[in-house]
């Protein structure tokens, strides 16, 4: 395994109110071990957006990086799909 491998996640922007920061909601699905039902888990991440190019509703890709603040450990890689409207 590569030493500097970093997590790359995809999710939807749910907030862009902060300067150069977006809040991204990442949803994952896992099978329950006993009941075999597919369960949805979601988690919010703060990500650095230097050019303020992502807006609410956009589908984005974020990558793990060094800590940029107390809660911000990801940065925006690209906007995959723009929100309609």
Swiss-Prot record:
InterPro entries with a match to the protein in the record: NA-bd_OB-fold, Ribosomal_uS17, Ribosomal_uS17_bact/chlr, Ribosomal_uS17_CS
Listed SUPFAM superfamilies: Nucleic acid-binding proteins (SSF50249)
Transmembrane segments: none
One protein family per Pfam: Ribosomal_S17
Keywords: Ribonucleoprotein, Ribosomal protein, RNA-binding, rRNA-binding
PROSITE patterns: RIBOSOMAL_S17 (PS00056)
GO CC aspect terms: cytosolic small ribosomal subunit
GO BP term, example: translation
Signal peptide, first to last residue: none
Assembly mode: Part of the 30S ribosomal subunit.
Function according to Swiss-Prot or TrEMBL: One of the primary rRNA binding proteins, it binds specifically to the 5'-end of 16S ribosomal RNA.
HAMAP family named among the record's database cross-references: Ribosomal_uS17_B
Name recorded for this polypeptide: Small ribosomal subunit protein uS17
Source species: Spiroplasma citri
